[in-house]
Amino acid sequence: MCRPTPKKNFTKCLPIIILFFTVLRILAGLRIPYMILADQRYDDRMLFENAYDLLSGVWLGSYDAYTLAKGIGYPMFLLLAKKLCLPYSVLLALLQAVGSWLFVRALSVRWKNPYGQTLLYLLLLFSPISLTQLVTQRLYRMAIVPGMVLVVFSGMIGLTLRKELPLKKQLPWAVLTGVALAFFWQIR
């Protein structure tokens, strides 16, 4: 399956390498300690209360001056983790993996080198910003920003690089860009 030919063509091994490192990144996410600053009434705690209210079917709870102080994007991300029965860390790592894959896929129309694409994917997958304490290790809305930035830029780059192609090839990238930007706006 992954046996190199005499020419040392390793392109058949690349999907296995990608899968191995993606699983490794997800497993690493399970071992990363996460923290929440529960005393931050209008930051961390509010986002978790909003997620709980969404789960309870109360939308964003009782309406007061702080109901719309934060966007609904992060509570929806927490709700998605709950509904999919996935640990938060796994969903966060999957967001980073999907963002990395989409970014490489967006560039693939112009950049055909499979080794370079694999290297870029791995660099984005293990990006230091996606593992730092102040951003992703805190259970706060900033944790999903690195992955969502990749998704948003992937959609824009993918659409731009395919502007000469038929509409059928552009449409998935246009939809991705629209949905990603709408969700990204709600992270605020």
Residue map of PLM features:
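Multi-pass, polyprenyl lipid-linked donor-dependent membrane glycosyltransferases
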Residues: 69, 91-95, 129-157, 183-187
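Membrane-interface alpha helices of multi-pass inner-membrane proteins
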Residues: 172-188
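Transmembrane-helix motifs of polytopic, lipid-linked glycan transferases
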Residues: 88-113, 151, 155
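Short hydrophobic/aromatic helix or loop-helix immediately within or flanking a transmembrane segment
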Residues: 46-54, 60, 64-86, 93
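Membrane-interface transmembrane helices that cradle and orient dolichyl/undecaprenyl
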Residues: 152-172
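Transmembrane-helix signature of polytopic, membrane-embedded enzymes
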Residues: 16, 103-129, 146-147
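Start-transfer (signal-anchor) and selected internal transmembrane alpha helices
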Residues: 1-30
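Helix-to-loop transition at the C-terminal end of transmembrane segments
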Residues: 24-45
